[in-house]
């Protein structure tokens, strides 16, 4: 009886493993992620792998080596994207996975890096186990995500020529940076992927918020990536002597701006939904303690999954500004800046496959939206996309304190692998 029981348990265990499919090598994944974190540190040992920096070049060389070890034919396209390709067994459109490895100044070691290293680990797992997908597999490490999702925008044909002149903290312009990465700004048109040219794209990413961590959930199934718009708001008053100008005779631009900041918060809260509005920067001129500010320039950012909601909130904020201007003897000017991204809904059928993958691995999951922009946002202009989130400890991101546990990272990679294989089986194009 004992032998029969042992045999039954062994068969059951093997059956469960077969149902779950292959799993990534968690130790290798986390070791490679840790190794990547060593590239691009500043003199204080802090993460600082900004796009186009020496550390970025070194990290990219490390990543290219891993991709080649995983059996991927790896090239750098004209926009500086690193693309590793493995042929499929059939003449089908490719399925893409990947993320980015560049970071904000003094950022963290997990934003983008988790998704990039997990995508490479997925390819390595398939290579190790001799699994050939029906669709060609593309692992894409996008260039300069933090500086305006440059690489993914180039693939989508949405990179504006004027963006090439934007200079980042390294001192290189975007155009110079592309050349530095091995790209070619004269051939950017060649990298554009027509709509429908890929079967699907799936990106694994840390949440960069605290919902999954707070609710003790393993996986976030992303419903959509919010769009965001930026404005510079200029408040014009009259600079005057702070000691000789009575309070009732002032045209204080900073006071009007302070009322505006409060109004932005109030208007964002009035609308039912998950929209957010932020004033994150403010500059008062002339900036002297004994002069009433005559001019203030501040930022305005609005994010939501709906363009219509962004429009409505912006209009409401403008109306509040008109009221404040009339009360304070000031004027408000709104200057729209280049948007970081349009709202992008993920494909519901890819969401379903991500949920199925999580459940097959006995991982808890919840639906959620992404409040941050991602490369998948621009890839949605090319093909159906999906996004998988894993918890960020304490909701901290864009900081050296950013952290996701090795277990959560491995869980996310396993969900990515399972989702990829399910899509490969089910997609017919």
Residue locations for each model-derived region?
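N-terminal hydrophobic or amphipathic helices/low-complexity stretches enriched
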Residues: 18-48, 87, 291-292
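Zn-dependent metallopeptidase/amidohydrolase metal-coordination segment
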Residues: 21, 26-32, 42, 95-99, ...
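A non-catalytic alpha/beta surface segment that caps or lines the substrate-entry region
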Residues: 41-87
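A short beta-alpha structural unit
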Residues: 51, 278-287, 299, 331-351, ...
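Catalytic-core environment of secreted peptidases
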Residues: 70, 82-114, 119
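Alpha-helical metal-binding/catalytic segments enriched in His/Glu/Asp
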Residues: 97, 106-146, 229-235, 241-267, ...
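Midchain, well-structured core segments that form catalytic/ion-binding scaffolds
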Residues: 148, 157-307
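His/Asp/Glu-rich mid-to-C-terminal helical/loop segments that flank catalytic regions of hydrolases
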Residues: 223-225, 241, 245-271, 314, ...
